[in-house]
């Protein structure tokens, strides 16, 4: 099951809601996933989804809150996956005109009928109604990527004005959704992980948001471990390179002028470095009597490297 299906399955359990919330939710579903048809038998409206939980919710909301006994149809998709496609159909005799009027989709002005797919003003004025509307928009046209791979949540709509309205509604919850055009569709999307979690909280997908939070924590831990490993590897590489350079300098001094020409403190550490090329500066310092700190050992080895460099340039 995809993560989108999990989220939809979770939020489709919200059926014990007020009539106002149900109207907002059904309005969003209709505007995102619905098709209006005119025929000899009158008007009909069809909502299409590949998610069985979404189809059941639409059917239940219509029956429980609007006394509309819609028709539920199922057919096989033409795609390679051959998924079922669920269609909830409301005909003239089932009360489609009243529902279209209640949702603000069908309006009559001076005897002329017109379609309006904007989000009505009253939706913006109540927190619970806003949440129900966004929940409906996700049920009708939303999707979310697998959070193990990437963070991306989107709503597919077919009107630029509607997409902008939906984005504005989402952003009343201090989110930063944006709108882009993709072929003939207008996409409202969020890409930042924390914001996706916040939106899932808005629509009531609490189990799903906890799953994303756990994934985000694990990703962050893995990234931190990788950073530490990379840092340790880089430091180890620098240490090894420095030790190789020091041994080469000491061998040059030994062959050119002899170790006996070095001051006692430098000869002492030079001999230790030759005998223990893999030891750290701290470990070399602890071998001396009295012991010398890491910075003191580093200072002596730098002096040795300087002497070797002078020998190289004097050739």
Swiss-Prot record:
One of its GO terms (molecular function) is endonuclease activity. The keyword Cell division applies. Gene3D superfamilies: Homing endonucleases (3.10.28.10). GO terms for biological process: cell division; regulation of sporulation. It comes from the Bacteria. Keywords: Cell cycle, Cell division, DNA-binding. Residues 280-313 bind DNA. SUPFAM superfamilies: Homing endonucleases. NCBIfam families: DNA_bind_WhiA. Involved in cell division and chromosome segregation. Belongs to the WhiA family. This is Probable cell division protein WhiA. It comes from Clostridium beijerinckii (strain ATCC 51743 / NCIMB 8052) (Clostridium acetobutylicum). The gene is whiA.
């Amino acid at each position: 099951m995809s993560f989108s299906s999990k989220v939809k399955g979770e939020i489709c359990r919200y059926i014990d809601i007020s009539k106002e919330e149900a109207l907002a939710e059904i309005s969003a579903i209709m505007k995102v996933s619905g098709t209006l048809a005119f025929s000899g038998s009158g008007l009909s409206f069809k909502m299409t989804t590949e998610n069985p939980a979404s189809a059941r919710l639409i059917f239940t909301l219509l029956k429980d809150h609007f006394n509309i006994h819609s028709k539920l149809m199922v057919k096989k998709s033409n795609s390679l996956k051959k998924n079922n496609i669920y269609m909830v159909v409301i005909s003239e005799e089932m009360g489609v005109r009243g529902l279209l009027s209640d949702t603000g989709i069908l309006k009559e002005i001076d005897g002329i009928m017109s379609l309006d797919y904007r989000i009505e003003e009253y939706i913006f004025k109540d927190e619970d109604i806003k949440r129900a509307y966004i929940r409906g928009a996700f049920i009708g046209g939303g999707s979310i990527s697998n959070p193990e791979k990437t963070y991306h949540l989107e709503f597919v709509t077919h009107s630029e004005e509607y997409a902008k309205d939906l984005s504005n509604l989402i952003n009343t919850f201090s989110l930063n959704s944006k709108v882009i055009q993709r072929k003939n569709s207008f996409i409202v999307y969020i890409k930042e992980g924390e914001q996706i979690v916040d939106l899932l909280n808005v629509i009531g997908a609490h189990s799903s948001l906890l799953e994303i939070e756990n994934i985000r924590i694990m990703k962050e831990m893995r990234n931190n471990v990788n950073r530490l490993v990379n840092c340790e590897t880089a430091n180890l590489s620098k240490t090894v390179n420095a030790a190789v350079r020091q041994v080469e300098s000491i061998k040059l001094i030994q062959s050119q002028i002899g170790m006996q020409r070095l001051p006692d403190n430098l000869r002492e550490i030079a001999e230790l470095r030759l005998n223990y090329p893999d030891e750290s500066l701290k470990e070399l310092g602890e071998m001396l009597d009295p012991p010398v700190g890491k910075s003191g050992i580093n200072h002596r080895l730098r002096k040795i490297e300087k002497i070797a460099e002078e020998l190289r340039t004097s050739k």
